[in-house]
Design a protein with these regions (language model features):
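Catalytic Zn2+-binding segment of zinc metalloproteases
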Residues: 7-21
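Post-HExxH zinc-binding segment in Zn-dependent metallohydrolases
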Residues: 15, 26-54, 63, 68, ...
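Single, functionally critical "micro-switch" positions that shape active/binding sites
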Residues: 3, 7, 32
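Short, glycine/acidic-rich hinge or "gate" loops at secondary-structure transitions
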Residues: 18-25, 48-59, 156-163
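An alpha-helix initiation/capping motif
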Residues: 29-33, 57, 61, 92-99
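Active-site-adjacent structural elements in folded domains
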Residues: 22-23, 61-66, 126-130
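C-terminal, non-catalytic "cap/extension" segments appended to globular domains
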Residues: 2, 10, 38, 49, ...
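Alpha-helix N-cap/helix-initiation motif
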Residues: 21-32, 131, 135
Length: 210
């Protein structure tokens, strides 16, 4: 949480000094979340100061959780698209739809012994569905770019940081797609953009498995 929020704080600090117009300091939600999620990974050389002998365990768990989050976050957005397109759905129909999506996005999870989840009510624990409709997909797009920064960091930490700093300095002067392309990265909207990132991270996870 600390490095995540520090990413937001750092972006504000830099933006207020680099960008003339205050209205252009903060980017869209997915851009802002890229600041924070990327900082979680780019601070990895200092993770030992937090976790000491458990640093390797944390870094492995962090990378795995980031990858696992992508199908779940996408499922949340897919569910909202269906629900908002069909406002007359009954509670049972919504639960049935969530169950169907679980089998598509997370078929490896067995909910049979968990009544709340097995009846398809798991979507109710996701606060964003109630309070921040359609915000969750922003996390997915930001996480994808953050993982791209992490993949760069594994091979060339200085280049990864330089691109990240350039990304931050642009603040909200460009769209999310414009920001990502400006620093030479692929956007999550490009076909085939996620595959190479997952492959790179998969190799790292296998190499650092505990």
């Amino acid at each position: 949480v600390l490095t995540h929020e520090m990413g937001h704080a750092f972006a504000d600090y830099v933006g207020e000094r680099e960008i003339k117009w205050l209205s252009n300091v903060t980017p869209s939600m997915e851009g802002a979340e890229t600041h924070s999620m990327s900082m979680e990974f780019l601070t990895s050389p200092w993770h030992r100061l937090f976790f000491a002998e458990d640093t390797a365990k944390y870094q492995l768990s962090h990378a795995e959780d980031a990858l696992i989050f992508l199908p779940y976050g996408t499922m949340v957005d897919h569910f909202q698209e269906i629900v908002y397109s069909n406002p007359d759905m009954t509670p049972d129909e919504r639960n049935a739809e969530w169950t169907r999506l679980e089998k598509i996005y997370r078929p490896y999870i067995d909910f049979d012994s968990l009544p709340f989840y097995s009846r398809g009510a798991g979507w109710q624990r996701q606060l964003h569905i109630y309070l921040y409709p359609f915000y969750y997909i922003d996390y997915c797009m930001a996480q994808t770019v953050a993982l791209e920064f992490f993949a760069l960091h594994l091979n060339d930490p200085e280049d990864a940081w330089r691109r990240y700093l350039d990304f931050v300095k642009l603040g909200g002067t460009k769209t999310f797609v414009g920001l990502v392309k400006s620093v030479g990265l692929k956007t999550p909207l490009e076909k085939g953009s996620i595959g190479p990132i997952v492959e790179e991270l998969g190799k790292w996870i296998e190499k650092n498995n505990i």
